[in-house]
Structure formats: structure tokens, C-alpha cells
């Protein structure tokens, strides 16, 4: 026989709706919006890493990455 615990008693109501489906679309629009926002976040991160997104005052004086200089990376001699 399974032992009853305080945590189990607290979590039991969360599992009482098992097997029942929510009518209509449920939380699908919220999930779609969050996926879209995550996609925008990933695109912004990609553009920053690729130096194709210019930010005012952030990219000034910063050398470009090797990807931004072309296929070969040739450091300048001192």
C-alpha cells in the first residue's frame, strides 16, 4: 500500500483532472505566442552573434568576429 505524504496530499488536486480534455483551444494561443516570442529571441541572438544587428554604442570600437570578416581570419600584425 502506498504511503500518504504531505506533498502527495498537496499535489493530488493537480492530478484529479486526468483523462479530461479542456473544451476548445484551451491554452494553445498562449503557447503559440510564447513560441513566436522565443523565435524572435533566437533571431536577435543570431544577429548579434553574426554582427549583423548594429546596436547604438555597443558595437563601436569592437573588432568584428572572424565570421564578419569573411571566410579566412587573418589577424593584423603588431
UniProtKB/Swiss-Prot annotation:
The keyword Phosphoprotein does not apply. It comes from Gloeobacter violaceus (strain ATCC 29082 / PCC 7421). The keyword Cell inner membrane applies. The gene is psbH. InterPro entries: PSII_PsbH, PSII_PsbH_sf. It comes from the Bacteria. Gene3D superfamilies: Photosystem II reaction center protein H (1.20.5.880). Pfam families: PsbH. This is Photosystem II reaction center protein H.
Amino acid at each position: 500500500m502506498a504511503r500518504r505524504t504531505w506533498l502527495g496530499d498537496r499535489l493530488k488536486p493537480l492530478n484529479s483532472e486526468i483523462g479530461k480534455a479542456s473544451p476548445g483551444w484551451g491554452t494553445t494561443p498562449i503557447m503559440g505566442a510564447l513560441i513566436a516570442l522565443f523565435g524572435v529571441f533566437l533571431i536577435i541572438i543570431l544577429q548579434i552573434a553574426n554582427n549583423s544587428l548594429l546596436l547604438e554604442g555597443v558595437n563601436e570600437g569592437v573588432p568584428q568576429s572572424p565570421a564578419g570578416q569573411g571566410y579566412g581570419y587573418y589577424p593584423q600584425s603588431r
